[in-house]
Amino acid sequence: MGAIAAGIAAGLAAVGAGVGNGLVIGHTLDGMARQPEMSGQLRGTMFLGVGLIEALPILSIVIAFLVMNK
C-alpha cells in the first residue's frame, strides 16, 4: 500500500512541477517579447522560479521513500 501511495505522490508532484514550469517559462517569454531590454533580468528570475518549482518533486520523492519504508 505504501508503494502505491509513494508512486501516486511522486507522479502528481511531477505533473504539478511540469505545469508550473510551463507557466513560468511561457510568461517569461511573453515578458521578453514585450520588453527585450529586460530579458537578462527576466531570465535570471525565471531560473530562480524554475529551481524553486523543481524542489517540490524532489521533496515529494524523499517523503514518498520515507512513507514507503515505514
UniProtKB/Swiss-Prot annotation:
What is the name of this protein?
ATP synthase subunit c
List the HAMAP family: ATP_synth_c_bact
Keywords for this protein: ATP synthesis, Cell membrane, CF(0), Hydrogen ion transport, Ion transport, Lipid-binding, Membrane, Transmembrane, Transmembrane helix, Transport
Please give the SUPFAM superfamilies that the UniProt record associates with this protein. Answer: F1F0 ATP synthase subunit C (SSF81333)
> MF terms per GO, please?
lipid binding; proton-transporting ATP synthase activity, rotational mechanism
**Functional description taken from the UniProt entry:** F(1)F(0) ATP synthase produces ATP from ADP in the presence of a proton or sodium gradient. F-type ATPases consist of two structural domains, F(1) containing the extramembraneous catalytic core and F(0) containing the membrane proton channel, linked together by a central stalk and a peripheral stalk. During catalysis, ATP synthesis in the catalytic domain of F(1) is coupled via a rotary mechanism of the central stalk subunits to proton translocation.
Supply the PROSITE patterns for this chain. Answer: ATPASE_C
Kindly give the InterPro entries that the UniProt entry links to this protein.
ATP_synth_csu_bac/chlpt, ATP_synth_F0_csu, ATP_synth_F0_csu_DDCD_BS, ATP_synth_F0_csu_sf, ATPase_proteolipid_c-like_dom, F/V-ATP_Csub_sf
Q: Does the keyword Repeat apply?
A: no
Instruction: Give the bilayer topology.
Output: Multi-pass membrane protein
- TM region positions: 4-24, 47-67
Give the record's family classification: Belongs to the ATPase C chain family.
**Quaternary state and interactors:** F-type ATPases have 2 components, F(1) - the catalytic core - and F(0) - the membrane proton channel. F(1) has five subunits: alpha(3), beta(3), gamma(1), delta(1), epsilon(1). F(0) has three main subunits: a(1), b(2) and c(10-14). The alpha and beta chains form an alternating ring which encloses part of the gamma chain. F(1) is attached to F(0) by a central stalk formed by the gamma and epsilon chains, while a peripheral stalk is formed by the delta and b chains.
Q: Where in the cell is it found?
A: Cell membrane
Q: NCBIfam families per the record?
A: ATP_synt_c, PRK06876.1
All disulfide bonds of the chain are: none
Listed GO CC annotations:
plasma membrane; proton-transporting ATP synthase complex; proton-transporting two-sector ATPase complex, proton-transporting domain
Record site feature (Reversibly protonated during proton transport), residues = E54
* Main subcellular location of this protein, as a coarse class: membrane
